Amino acid sequence: MREPDRRSVELNELGWWSKWAKLRWRDDGYVLYSDKFREPFFNRGGSLTCRAAAPAAAWVERALSQRKMTPTFLAFEDCRAAEKLTASSYVREDTMAVLSSRGPVGGGAGAQAVSPSASSDEWASAYLRSFYGDEALVGPVASIVSSLFHSRGVTLLESRARGEVAGVLAIFRTRGVAGVYCVGTVPEHRRRGVASGLLTRAKKLADAEGRSLVLQTLESDGALGLYLARGFGVMYTKAVLQKRLK
């Protein structure tokens, strides 16, 4: 299957996170921001093209500074914008790798789709425990999950063990693309094939629909090796840049 172009993958990602945070555009530049989730991941900007990166970075900086947030900008590694920003007042905080599935995932525990009647609290709890280690934000996350049950193009998957949700994964579909998000395993269920099982189910769904399965992962999360071992390959990378605070 032919891999989707970069713009299609980026629009899929932004379409997904616009369900969690507010999304604003200026030409090919964008900014995400949230009052509920104050971490940089939900308060960041970027550009769909290299040409628009410089003006987009200036606009994103103003927009996030007005919200009392540290300006965070994601720049394609093959754009000179990353070099220019780091040469001025930005520092690299992380790297985001964008991957596509290029073969069978293989192995893993079984996963099932979540029905609209299922508990949004339970899915949200597993997501938060997987990524944050606590459930402090279960209220706002459960509210989003509840709306996702009925959102077009979204499928929520879960893997259960010992009577509870052991891992979660979300699929968001756009033209030709099935984006995978929120791949998480609850700590006490790790190293038991939970994530592999979820990815296997997602791969089967994407293949059946004729879509490319793609995902993003941050270098700091330490999951890149897992995905590479499960048949994914790197399409491109983005520098996660933050403005130095004076």
Annotate the PLM regions.
Residues 1-6, 51, 111-125:
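A short beta-loop-alpha structural element at the N-terminal edge
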Residues 58-68, 173, 197-212, 233:
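Conserved acyl-CoA
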Residues 73-80, 214-224, 241-245:
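Conserved beta-strand-loop-alpha-helix junction that forms the acyl-donor binding cleft
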Residues 137-186:
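A conserved beta-strand-loop-helix scaffold within acyl/acetyltransferase catalytic domains
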Residues 92-102, 233-246:
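Conserved catalytic-core motifs of GNAT/GCN5-like acyltransferases
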Residues 79-92, 196, 219-237:
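Conserved active-site alpha-helix within GNAT-family acetyltransferase domains
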Residues 53-61, 182-185, 191-204, 229:
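Conserved acetyl-CoA-binding loop-helix of GNAT-fold acetyltransferases
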Residues 1-67, 78, 82, 150:
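N-terminal charged segments
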